[in-house]
Curated annotation (Swiss-Prot):
Negatively regulates transcription of bacterial ribonucleotide reductase nrd genes and operons by binding to NrdR-boxes. It comes from the Bacteria. GO terms for molecular function: ATP binding; DNA binding; zinc ion binding. This is Transcriptional repressor NrdR. It holds the Pfam family ATP-cone. Keywords: ATP-binding, DNA-binding, Metal-binding, Nucleotide-binding, Repressor, Transcription, Transcription regulation, Zinc, Zinc-finger. InterPro entries: ATP-cone_dom, NrdR-like_N, RNR_NrdR-like. Residues 49-139 form the ATP-cone domain. Binds 1 zinc ion. A zinc finger (unnamed) spans 3-34. Belongs to the NrdR family. Its cofactor is Zn(2+).
Length: 156
């Protein structure tokens, strides 16, 4: 494994364990040249799944695109990279278990919102505003009132 700091080819594995979602092996490595440590993940082959978009287009499922959307929603919030990774891992595992070749972007969005709602309300609202295509303040207000009515207005 090549060191991301000095590009040296020789590294050693210090620790190896199963990820929280149990779909990857997390390895802590140390470069034998510069001594710096870094983490790698070993995952099974990517999920071969098509996402049906709102406009009728189909595109391959992309966990990195999902992760990027979560990172934007969670920016400057108390949500760690590990928590974002766990959400992505959980959603990918749930989609894999369905054993279907196609899923709607709406279904994926609903899965994300369900998890963000339990994690961070500001991130939830940010994601919902894009996913549900809010165009004015009244739509935000309605969502906030709905959340407050369900006792879920705390977070962030």
């Amino acid at each position: 494994m090549q060191c991301p700091y000095c590009d040296h080819e020789d590294t050693k594995v210090i620790d190896s364990r199963l990820s929280e979602a149990k779909d990857a092996i997390r390895r802590r490595r140390e470069c034998l040249a510069c001594g710096k440590r870094f983490t790698t993940y070993e995952r099974r082959e990517p999920l071969r799944l098509m996402v049906l978009k709102r406009d009728g287009r189909r595109e391959p499922f992309d966990r990195e695109k999902l992760r990027a959307g979560l990172e934007k929603a969670c920016a400057k919030q108390r949500v760690t990279g590990e928590q974002i990774d766990l959400i992505v891992d959980q959603i990918e595992a749930e989609l894999r278990e369905r054993r279907r070749h196609e899923v709607t972007s709406r279904r994926i969005g609903d899965m994300v919102l369900a998890r963000l709602r339990r994690l961070d309300m500001v991130a939830y609202l940010r994601f919902a505003s894009v996913y549900r295509q809010y165009t004015d303040v009244d739509q935000f207000r309605s969502e906030l009132l709905r959340l407050a009515g369900s006792g879920m207005s705390k977070g962030g």
